[in-house]
Amino acid sequence: MARSDGFSPRKSLRRSAREHSRSYVGQGSNDDFDDMYSPPSRRRGSGGGDGNGYTRSGRKIHHSRYYEEDYQDAISSDDERMYRPRRNSNSLTYRQQCKQAIDESKRIQKVPPAKRKRIYMSDDEEEFVETRQMENTAPDRPTRRSSRRMSSTHEEPDVLDQEDVSPIRRTRRTTIRFGSEPVEENMEVPRVLETNDMANEAIVQAVDNTENGETEEDVIEKIGREEEEEGDEEEAESGEKEQVGLLFHRIFNQAYLQEDEESSNAESSEESTAPRQYSLRRRQPVVQFNQSEARENRRARLEHHRAANANRHHRNRNTSNRRRRSGSDSDSDDMVLPRPDKRQSRPHMHNRGERERGRFMPINMTEKELQSAQHILMDRMRKTDAGQGASDIDPMSVDSSVGFDQVGGLSHHIQSLKEVVLFPMLYPEVFAKFKINPPKGVVFYGPPGTGKTLVARALANECRRGANKVAFFMRKGADCLSKWVGESERQLRLLFDQAYAMRPSIIFFDEIDGLAPVRSSKQDQIHASIVSTLLALMDGLDGRGEVVVIGATNRLDSLDPALRRPGRFDRELRFSLPDLNARRHILDIHTSKWEENKPTPETLDGIAEKTSGYCGADLKFLCTESVLIGLRSRYPHIYMCSERLKLDITTIKITEEHFGHAMRRITPASRRDLTIPSRPLDERTSILLGDIVKNLISLRIPQGYRCVENAMATASTELEQVVRALEPNLTVPAIRLLLCGSPSLSDGGQTSYVLPAILAKLDHLPVFSLSVSSLLTDGRPEEAFSNAVQSAMRASATGPCIMLLPSIDEWIKVIPVSVQHMLITCLESMTGFTPILFLSTLDSSFEDAPEYATEVFRHANCISLNPSRRSVRKRYFEFVIDGVRRKPKVFDPTIYEMPQADDDSPEAKPSRKLNDDETRELLKMYTALQRQMRMFFKERLSRLIRDRRFVEFVEPVDPEEAEDYYEIIETPICMQDIMEKLNKCEYNHADKFIADLVLIQSNALEYNPSNTKDGKLIRQMANTFRDAIDDMIDCELDESFVERIEMVSRMLQDAGVTPTSDQLLTEIPKGFSRKKPWTMANTLAKEIEQWKAEREAENEKLKEKLGISTDTAQSAIEENKSEEGTSSSVEEIKKKLNKKKKDQKRNKKASSQDPDGDDTEETEEAVAENNVDADVEMKETPADPVPTIQSSSSQEREIIVSADSITDLIKLCVEKSEGWSVSELERLSSVLSHTIERFRDEWNRENLPEQLAQIVREWEATDATNEKIANGKASNKNGIVFNGY
């Protein structure tokens, strides 16, 4: 008869024992669960009598925790999935049930195994086993590994994605697998691992029935003591463990049968045709205590708990009469689950916050250092009550070798950081005495590559030294940004809370302008909220304590102005480009560890002079490039060979030439945007303008602009530097300079050469350009001009700066009049002590300057550049024409010795760097692979030993039966010997094991003849033995498992790690990589032999290349010997020279633009032949030699050129260039240099001076050419105007 449709006040507790046992174990846990979800009137200690009562429908409530009667009608279908009815029909006490279970288990042990194996199996399990037997697939043995595999198959599909390291081939189905046996041999073991849930249910049921408050452990201990009194002591100890397992299974069977009975009764009641009461409508109960909201909350929590369990346990929810199966989630045999945490307020959010809070860890502290102060940190974290969650960022790793001693040219910044960070910790009494707060904010700004992040790294390492350690948090601007609303603010708050808990601490924001830009109406509201949060955290109502905030940015003007005030960012440190002294210091730091390969001080001084405009990052890269160039010039063979060669590092000398090659490869960071025309004078133009630039800087520019920190730069000791740092900087007046031409020459190179050279000398100062291109970029010149002037005024508040206005005469023609008036107003507003150098150029003389230029600059501010003097031009053209005397470069490979291979060098460092955790995991993996391989081989070898067909190969041959066996067979072996080797871990690869098995067959075939009956039989057995080996390896051994062992062994060798238990595959050479998969035919040794053969072939090809180049170069050297003797005839010399002329004709035809080039080439050939005759006559009659430039070595060939012709050419160039501008001289020298380069590979250059003189005679200056073009007279015989090249 169906019961009424009432609701009970204890309905929330109607859960099956399985649901309780999955989360809690023991009486205490169930009581906690009862107190959590029970009404106050039903809780323990709150009164309420014995708990008996009646519901509103008239049903009796018993004293037990669960109802006795079925309530299938009272709950919905959804509740049925969470709750399971349970009858408490046990009339025996807990001790009686345990005793009965022990007796039943003893009785079962006497039953034969064939009848015993199905006792602990349900109907579903029997059906499952029968299905697997029909598929001829034996289930795995319930070991730790197989139980984990079974649970992952039925419950966790994502575990199958992990890589299997078993040596068994997975593509074949075999009856016997590695690490498993047929199920019939193992069904005797109780299936404890698969019945954890039901056993836990039995424990809870037993605990519920315990008398006098005894727990499960007390009952089991009492049972154990009773058994010890009855039997032997040793049998009792072993039986105590077995009794617990048998007890679990006995109670499990009772509970399972009881559930099946209840399910069948429920189904039969549902199928009955009797009419149900209250079938027309549901009767809603009267809620007395308004528990609907609490009931919904409880249902939500239970639903969440059920969903969490569903992710781990796949249950069959469609069939109500089928037992819910769930395997163990752990590979442990322990049945006791951990007690739940008693945090009631959102424990999952608390755990998430604890986990994500751990990601905000300082970057300069090790794990051991954090654990030593863990109790203090945890106490602080409880007090701060920070948010929950953080950004998904791991702490950055910082190079611990970087310190303040590795930072050059920034001594003032280092002293300022010490005042902010170190002094408040070391000398707090000073701040306490004067009631002041130390600075808590510093912002680094300056161009890229000037050392902002480097100083932060050095500060992080300095903070971890000494007794008082400072936590250093390093975050980039984008790290704290998130797409979720409010997430960025929460992460900032959590970061500051973590820093406050670990105080004293430092927070470094790299590229802070991306995190806190200027707030405006055009900006997104999210960024404004982030900036507001950062402002409040840095200086809000609650002080941040001993937390220092450091920010770094390349654009200080883009930072929000609210951050740039005392209390937030107290100090602003500018990182400018290093000056001459700073560059010299940086070069000393980067070359200090080169030891004997370090360049000379004179070389470093020259490099520091030439690297004007280079930042610290550029100088570091310059040193790297120079070393690579030096390595290439000393050992070019490493570029042609992929293997490691043995190098003598001490022979690599880094010279100034190597630095020069590296400087041509590098473009400094300050010159890549081309906004500032800073360019030093090269060696050629310095002859013309070097003295002018030097005198101009020393005489017209004050000392304060040349060196900002002059007081500290001139100090001799560190103490003097610290004391003199308090001295005010030198007085720097406001200066205006106008570079213009002279009345005789308007273009003296003031805009193209002198102005960039001056900026290169003053590259440590910030430069603000007012050029036409910078003002007209966005079409709003007034706004661009205002921004540039305001930036210059702000920069002048902290130090000198430069305002640049090139070509003011052209600037006036393009820029609007409003901007011109703004410039005059700006210059008039500057006082005499505003440290701004206003530098401009004028492309004419001051007398011809526009009226506006004379208003801005007075005559005293004008510097006129006169034409170059005669002596200067003579030195200039001597430098240009000196290339005529330069000998052709002949490659001599004999000076480059081929280094030897260095594969087995003990000095070679590991090519793969692994940390301790990675090394430990790799060693663990290699040990596990070796162990699985040995287990696999032992099992297969045991199978071969048990095979009666191969009984002759099990034991060693008896010498009495075969007297000459050990004389004929060199390496006798049997399967017992192989098993002993396996036990001694002598096999680290499958090839060795297979080779020993094959050796048994080869020994049998070698000793036993084929003409005897016994010999034929043994030979047949040996061949069958070989077939069994091949079939076993081919069908059961996975080739990827063998390749995995090789790969892990090679990784350990590359990392320089040697395991203690197992041996590495020492036969694998360095650099080896398998090209074909492993098979029995393609063994590791065969693959290594093929790899070595290919490598030898590559070495032979390399030697052939080197041999061909050596022979060719040697023949060229022998051709160029001047001591060839009279045996060399004139015809041979003519043939060699004519051969070279023919090769040069192709280049001349391609580069020549003269239509009469063929006649010229024929004339050159005739002249060359005449020169050859003259050369031979000169060798035969040395009394009348041809005038040549003598070489320092008499054995080398001399260049055929006339010295008088070169002198006449230089004189012609000096006279022709009278009154020319620097630009015109540079154009002429470029044409002359190009012509000289065409003859760089020739020894006969006698006609070269005449060609150069012809170019100079026909050259016309730009001004004179323009006049002749206007008159129509400027043309040569070919119709080409020589106004350039």
Curated annotation (Swiss-Prot):
Keywords, ordered alphabetically: ATP-binding, Bromodomain, Nucleotide-binding, Transcription
Biased composition regions of type Acidic residues, renumbered to the chain: 226-237, 258-270, 1155-1175
BP-aspect Gene Ontology terms: nucleosome assembly; nucleosome disassembly; transcription initiation-coupled chromatin remodeling
Family annotation (Gene3D superfamilies): 1.10.8.60, Bromodomain-like, P-loop containing nucleotide triphosphate hydrolases
InterPro entries: AAA+_ATPase, AAA_lid_3, ATAD2-like, ATPase_AAA_core, ATPase_AAA_CS, Bromodomain, Bromodomain-like_sf, Bromodomain_CS
Basic residues: bias regions: 311-325, 1136-1149
Protein's organism: Caenorhabditis briggsae
Domain Bromo positions: 928-1032
Annotated function: Thought to form a complex that enhances transcription from repetitive DNA sequences by modulating chromatin structure.
Family of this protein: Belongs to the AAA ATPase family.
Molecular function, one GO term: chromatin binding
CDD domains found in the cross-reference section: Bromo_AAA, RecA-like_Yta7-like
Identification of the protein by name: Tat-binding homolog 7
Hydrolase as UniProt keyword: no
GO cellular component entries: nucleus
A Pfam family it matches: AAA_lid_3
Region (Disordered): 1-95, 121-173, 224-243, 258-359, 1100-1196
